[in-house]
Amino acid sequence: MALSAEKTSFTFADYLVWDEDEHIELIDGEAVRMAPPSTVHQLISGELSRQLANFLEGKKCRAIPAPFAVRLFEGADDTPADVQTVVEPDISVICDRSKLDEHGCKGAPDMVIEILSPSTRRHDRLVKLNLYQRAGVKEYWIVSPSDQTVEVLLLKDSWLVPHAFYEKDGIAKVNALEGCFIELCKVFGE
């Protein structure tokens, strides 16, 4: 089912009946259409997912790539009609399996990775940063394919603050997963 042109505020109940091919996020009830990812975006996402999945094999945490619905502020008694914010991070790392259900993740993932594109750069750096901070995401990676860099932000005193900056030949430490390191030369295709 397509988005209703008459309706101005949406919930997770609406989201659940939309066409799966549409890439839409809900931000405080507003439907935000997302552009389809580029080939470079998908290659970077695939390599990050592969390295994370290899590290997490046999462990309790899971790395889940988009499309994957994350209801950042869903409460225990909320119904789909109550939830007004649903995002689809490029990669979500969840260590509390009780947050996982048939529709995605209830609450904040431990770590979120967003891969920038020209159309999402502002959205990922401002809107989503604010949402992830409010929700209590512990670690947020902002990956820039054009600059071949990774910016790592960690939650400190309820604020996501810059912690580390890595370039294409670096080895990035995943703070949310003890002992996990990502080889960026493989992520950026070298």
Which stretches of residues belong to each language-model region?
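Gly/Pro/Ser/Thr-rich low-complexity, intrinsically disordered segments predominantly at protein N-termini
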Residues: 1-190
